[in-house]
């Protein structure tokens, strides 16, 4: 049995998502819910952020948008922190 990863959004990420056009928002939500949550290793589809304070965060590219996430292995949770264009 494969456990699905839980996708959660910070309040600021939700606000950023609401500011996007509907098509972009749906594309991001679909990507996170259908692709990332079903992966055995969500890191396989992303890139680690590099820098002294950024080593714990991962980035996904969806079209022209960048999704910044914290992958929490102990809870099988991908926390979306920021959505940038």
Residue spans of the language-model regions?
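Enriched for short, Lys/Arg-rich terminal
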Residues: 1-6, 11, 15-19, 26, ...
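Residues in soluble alpha-helical coiled-coils and helical-bundle/repeat scaffolds
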Residues: 19-22, 36-37
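A short, surface-exposed loop/turn module that caps and links secondary-structure elements
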Residues: 34-59
């Amino acid at each position: 049995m494969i456990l699905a990863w839980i996708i959660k959004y910070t309040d600021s990420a939700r606000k950023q998502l609401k500011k996007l056009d509907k098509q972009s928002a749906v594309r991001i939500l679909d990507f996170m819910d259908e692709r990332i949550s079903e992966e055995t290793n969500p890191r396989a589809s992303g890139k680690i952020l590099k820098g002294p304070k950024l080593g714990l965060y991962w980035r996904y590219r969806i079209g022209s948008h960048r999704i910044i996430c914290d992958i929490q292995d102990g809870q099988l949770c991908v926390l979306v922190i920021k959505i940038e264009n």
